[in-house]
C-alpha cells in the first residue's frame, strides 16, 4: 500500500514537472505607457496560442521609459521580444547585435503594428484655455513632458513641437526658439510616460501634459472619467510603435517561433481591435474605420517628412551636444 502511495505521489510530481516544462515563458520588454494595452493583448494571446499550437504559454511584461528599456536589454535583460515606441531604440539594439539588422523587414508596416500621436491633457474645464502649441509657451503655463533622452514619449513631444513650427512655414531657427520657450515652461522632466502622468495627476504638477493619445484611456481607467480634458493640437506627429524579436534571447531559450507568433498576433483583427479600444491607432484600415469615433481627425506629419528619420533626428537633436542640450537648461 505504501509503495502504491509513493508511486502515485511520484507520478504527480512527474506530471507537475512535465506541465511546468511544457509551459513556455515569453518576456515582452516594452515602453512605459503600454502596460494596460499589453495586459489585454496577453490575455487574448494565451488562448490564441493554445488553440494554434496546443501549447501553454505565460507572457511576462516589463515597462519603463523606452530608451532605458533598450539599454537594459542590451545589458543582458532576457527579453524575447521588444515592443517600443521609437525605431531608434530598436535600431540601438540592432547595432548591438541583439536584434536582427533587417528587423523592420520581418513584419508588416516596417514592423510597426500600431501608431499613436501626441496630444495635450489639461485640467478639467481647461482653466488655462489651452488650444494649440502656441499656448504652451505663454507665461504662467507649466508643461509636463518626458525627458527626450530617456523616453520615446519625450522625443515625439519635442519633434511634434518642432514640426508644428515647420508645418506653419517656419525655419529651423524659429523652431529652435519656439521649443526653447516651451521647455522653459517645463518645471521638471519626467523619466517616462507613466511618470509624467503621475506627476500631472497625482502630484498636481503643471497645467498641461503632452503625451500619447493612448494615455487618454489609461487616465480615464485609473483616475476616473472627466478628470482631464483632451486637446487636439492643429498639427501633430505620427508616432510608430515598432516591434522586434530579440535574437540573442530566443536562440538561447529556443523561443524563436513563440516570439514570432506573438508579434504576428499583433497584426490580427483581434489584436488590432484591442489596440483601438486603448486609443492606439491600428495599422488595419478596416479596424481604424470601425473605431473612427475614437480617433479625432488631426493633421499629421511623419518623422521622415521633416527630420529624415528618427536616427537622423537622434543625432541632430538628442545625442550629447545636440539641439536639445543647447536649448534646455537643467533647473
Language-model segment annotations:
Residues 1-9:
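Bacterial N-terminal signal peptides that target proteins for export
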Residues 23-151, 292-293, 328-329:
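N-terminal segment of the mature folded domain
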Residues 29-31, 122-124, 142-168, 182-186, ...:
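Short beta-strand->loop
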Residues 112-116, 178-183, 190-191, 223-256, ...:
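Periplasmic-binding protein-like
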Residues 125-131, 150, 163-171, 249-257:
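Short helix-loop capping/hinge motifs at secondary-structure junctions, enriched
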Residues 250-331:
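Extracellular/periplasmic juxtamembrane helices and adjacent flexible linkers that interface
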